[in-house]
């Protein structure tokens, strides 16, 4: 295990350029890449992409389909700072932005952008924070610190790329943080990680 490689800073980058970097690296020299949201598709648990679709996209045989939920995705992106704010306030952890595009030290195809990073107030240990939002009818997926499997794969992949031991989600679905916010945490699990990278 080793620290990740910082490939580039995505601050101010256009969406098209960001997508190019995610697909082939900033120099265009990586034949194919895997990102955190791809992992669920590889394992067949993504609600949005099948393993075959992902393979065809990565091999250049198919263009990504326009997302039916493009407005929801945009809204989720816009709400990330709110999810990060409430996580910081409720957990006491120091949360900060990191606009880097990172590459796994041992698996050059594995790239990651993190929603946020944090340092634990209890011991200063670093972690990766994934910021999510959902509708009320999806809130039960987060009940009792549950994590939807497709998101768990994503965060476990990010922990591996970042080479850190802790991760957390901040997911909200309403305007009352006392009842409408879930903040489940996970610890790095090398057995599960090996499943992802084998």
Predicted regions and their residues:
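Charged, glycine-rich intrinsically disordered N-terminal tails and low-complexity linkers that flank
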Residues: 1-78
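Basic, amphipathic N-terminal segments that precede the first structured/catalytic domain
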Residues: 81-84
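Nucleic-acid nuclease catalytic cores
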Residues: 73, 86-114, 118-198
């Amino acid at each position: 295990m080793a620290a990740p490689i910082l490939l580039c800073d995505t601050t101010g980058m256009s969406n098209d350029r960001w997508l190019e970097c995610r697909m082939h690296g900033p120099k265009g020299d990586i034949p194919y890449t895997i990102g955190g949201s791809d992992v669920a598709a590889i394992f067949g648990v993504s609600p949005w992409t099948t393993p075959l679709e992902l393979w065809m996209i990565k091999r250049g045989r198919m263009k990504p389909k326009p997302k039916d939920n493009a407005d929801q995705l945009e809204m989720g992106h816009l709400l990330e700072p709110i999810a990060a704010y409430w996580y910081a306030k409720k957990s006491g952890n120091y949360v900060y932005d990191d606009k880097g595009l990172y590459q796994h030290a041992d698996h050059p195809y594995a790239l990651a952008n993190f929603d946020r990073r944090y340092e634990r107030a209890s011991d200063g240990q670093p972690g990766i924070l994934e910021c999510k939002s959902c509708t009320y009818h999806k809130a039960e997926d987060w009940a009792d610190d549950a994590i939807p499997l497709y998101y768990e794969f994503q965060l476990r992949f990010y922990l591996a790329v970042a080479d850190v031991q802790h991760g957390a989600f901040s997911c909200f679905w309403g305007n009352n943080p006392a009842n409408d916010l879930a903040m489940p945490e996970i610890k790095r699990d090398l057995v599960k990680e090996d499943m992802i990278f084998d």
